């Protein structure tokens, strides 16, 4: 949608009546928390498996457990990185909204300008044809 083709009253009203950036910032914080939990789980799980198979448990079962758990740890690490990226993108969306909001003329000012245009137009048409 090209907002440049919409009247300023519509763009201004939409920008000022919406929920604002807070929900995006809350979502970013939640994604950050999830990323931290996933990273912690990956680190702890990997550490426990490494200690268990390296010090207390030997043989084919140990080797098999280590091989089978590696993809899970990798998945946790990859998912933690992706959730961190999602948090970063949510913060970027909130920042973009804040910038757009700051650059948007408030609805009351748009209404005032429209009113002034109407008054000036009416005044100009009333004095049309009269000598200066």
From Swiss-Prot:
SUPFAM superfamilies from the UniProt entry: PE/PPE dimer-like
Classification via Gene3D superfamilies: PPE superfamily
InterPro entries according to UniProt: PPE_dom, PPE_sf
Entries under Pfam families matching the protein: PPE
Highest taxon, organism lineage: Bacteria
PANTHER family: GLUTAMINE-RICH PROTEIN 2 (PTHR46766:SF1)
Family as reported in the entry's similarity comment: Belongs to the mycobacterial PPE family.
Miscellaneous comment as given in the Swiss-Prot or TrEMBL entry: Was identified as a high-confidence drug target.
Protein name, entry field: Uncharacterized PPE family protein PPE50
Organism: Mycobacterium tuberculosis (strain ATCC 25618 / H37Rv)
């Amino acid at each position: 949608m090209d907002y440049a083709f919409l009247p300023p009253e519509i763009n201004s009203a939409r920008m000022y009546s919406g929920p604002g950036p807070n929900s995006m910032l809350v979502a970013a914080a939640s994604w950050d928390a999830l990323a931290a939990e996933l990273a912690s789980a990956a680190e702890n799980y990997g550490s426990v498996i490494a200690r268990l198979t390296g010090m207390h448990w030997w043989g084919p079962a140990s080797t098999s457990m280590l091989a089978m758990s590696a993809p899970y740890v990798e998945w946790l690490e990859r998912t933690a990185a992706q959730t961190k990226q999602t948090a970063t993108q949510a913060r970027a969306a909130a920042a973009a909204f804040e910038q757009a909001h700051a650059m948007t003329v408030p609805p009351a000012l748009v209404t005032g300008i429209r009113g002034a245009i109407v008054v000036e137009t009416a005044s100009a048409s009333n004095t049309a044809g009269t000598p200066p």
